[in-house]
Amino acid sequence: MNCFAPLPKWRHTFTLDWGTPWWGFDLLLRWRYLGSTTTDRSSSEPLLKSAYYPSTATIPAYNYIDLGGSIPVGDHVELRAGVNNIADKNPPLILNGALTDCPNTTCNNNTWVGTYDTLGRYIYFNVTAQF
């Protein structure tokens, strides 16, 4: 993890898409993985080492599972529905990295929204019509 965002050594998205033999029903399973990461500030390297919060120096690995499906309705309409982040896993709570304004609280910057799923579990429904 650097000062801008977590950079795990390993992260991936694995998608399994099964076109079932039943009425054109398509089933999708997605696994999103973010490996664990440690702040550069806890490094033994003198150029990287600086003050940090020990409680958030390491972020554990995160797994998110999504499930969806689609089915054609007639020749020109497709229905799609699914659930992202089925387990409703919350993002890691990270203390303020500045170590100045809020040393004992999370302030407003309590996670990395560009890296972790901050919406929690959400259900979606989609209709696609082709003309």
Residue map of PLM features:
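C-terminal beta-barrel architecture of Gram-negative outer-membrane proteins
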Residues: 2-72, 88, 96
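C-terminal beta-signal and adjacent terminal beta-strands/loops
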Residues: 32-44, 70-131
